Amino acid sequence: MFTLKKSMLLLFFLGTISLSLCEEERNADEDDGEKEVKRGIFALIKTAAKFVGKNLLKQAGKAGLEHLACKANNQC
């Protein structure tokens, strides 16, 4: 009877340790995934800002050139 209790206690102890190791590994994997998502969102925002900025500068440049041409030809 005593050896059965020792065996059960040993199995419980080993199961608890393996469960805690699995949980730690799962938590580590989840943390890495969040960092990748954050990087992905930041890259998306950065790319969108570059695109919008480039288009705004093009439009401003065209408007500025048209205004200068208008002033130069006195057609305003």
From Swiss-Prot:
Gene Ontology process terms (BP): defense response to bacterium; defense response to fungus; innate immune response; killing of cells of another organism
Record's GO cellular component terms: extracellular region
UniProt propeptide residues: 23-39
Localisation per UniProt entry: Secreted
Protein family per UniProt: Belongs to the frog skin active peptide (FSAP) family. Esculentin subfamily.
Cysteine pairs bridged by disulfides in the record: 70-76
Record carries keyword Secreted: yes
Function: Antimicrobial peptide with activity against Gram-positive and Gram-negative bacteria and against fungi. Has been tested against S.aureus (MIC=2.5 ug/mL), B.pumilus (MIC=2.5 ug/mL), B.cereus (MIC=7.5 ug/mL), E.coli (MIC=12.5 ug/mL), B.dysenteriae (MIC=7.5 ug/mL), A.cacoaceticus (MIC=25.0 ug/mL), P.aeruginosa (MIC=50.0 ug/mL) and C.albicans (MIC=2.5 ug/mL). Also shows a weak hemolytic activity.
Record key words, sorted: Amphibian defense peptide, Antibiotic, Antimicrobial, Cleavage on pair of basic residues, Disulfide bond, Fungicide, Immunity, Innate immunity, Secreted, Signal
Organism lineage: Eukaryota, Metazoa, Chordata, Craniata, Vertebrata
UniProt signal peptide: 1-22
Pfam families (alphabetical): FSAP_sig_propep
Originating species: Amolops loloensis (Lolokou Sucker Frog)
Name of the protein in question: Esculentin-2-ALa
Reported tissue expression: Expressed by the skin glands.
